[in-house]
From Swiss-Prot:
Entry's family note: Belongs to the RNase PH family.
Keyword vocabulary terms for this entry: Nucleotidyltransferase, RNA-binding, rRNA processing, Transferase, tRNA processing, tRNA-binding
Purpose of the protein: Phosphorolytic 3'-5' exoribonuclease that plays an important role in tRNA 3'-end maturation. Removes nucleotide residues following the 3'-CCA terminus of tRNAs; can also add nucleotides to the ends of RNA molecules by using nucleoside diphosphates as substrates, but this may not be physiologically important. Probably plays a role in initiation of 16S rRNA degradation (leading to ribosome degradation) during starvation.
Entry EC no(s): 2.7.7.56
One annotated GO molecular function: tRNA binding
Name of the molecule in the record: Ribonuclease PH
Subunit-structure text: Homohexameric ring arranged as a trimer of dimers.
Recorded name of the encoding gene: rph
Presence of the UniProt keyword Transferase in the record: yes
CDD domains tied to this protein: RNase_PH_bact
Record-level GO BP terms: rRNA catabolic process; rRNA processing; tRNA processing
Amino acid sequence: MRPSGRTPEQLRPITITRQYTCHAEGSVLVEFGRTKVLCTATVTEGVPRFLKGKGQGWVTAEYGMLPRSTHSRMHREAASGKQGGRTLEIQRLIARSLRAAVDLTKLGENTITVDCDVLQADGGTRTASITGACVALADALNWMLAKGSLKTNPLNFMVAAVSVGIYEGAPVCDLDYDEDSSAETDMNLVMTETGKMIEIQGTAEGEPFSQEELMQLLELGKQGIQQIIQHQRQALA
């Protein structure tokens, strides 16, 4: 039995609130149960130096957690002037996932930066960030289209993510903190709405997992992501 009483395939309640802030070209508050992440997409003219003159754009991301987004206060990374390894890993994952969905040649020499700020953490902050970031990105691209900065929409498909794992010997989907902290296997999946994989991150925290269990987790995650993308599409409708 899962601590929350959910069935193995059951996701936490998901809410996606668009236009959550008034300044950003795209802004979304995404909630997976008690995990809440604010995702804002900012459009700027120009591209990084390595892309200048190539006629394409760039999509990047930053990730951070508020000091009291967790059970006890975390040290604010900005105060130390250095981002931690986990932060860098997650923001690169978010950026890679978003770029996989975009035709950068249709973006022109523009950059979209998506900031993902965790307001409250209860497991799955990186997967919630990717899910919300894609909606914020879609809104930013629609803003550019309405402004006349783009001729066609560069977004090829939606992207979403979910965590899966083996908890007390059983495969489960969308782990909360209680499950994640004691899972035998922890895995993050990023997929497109067409069912293709973008990233698989998996680790046996306790007992090694079999190929059969891996396939079960992938199928569980695929089903979960299909439901999450429905939430994205409903939010954008």
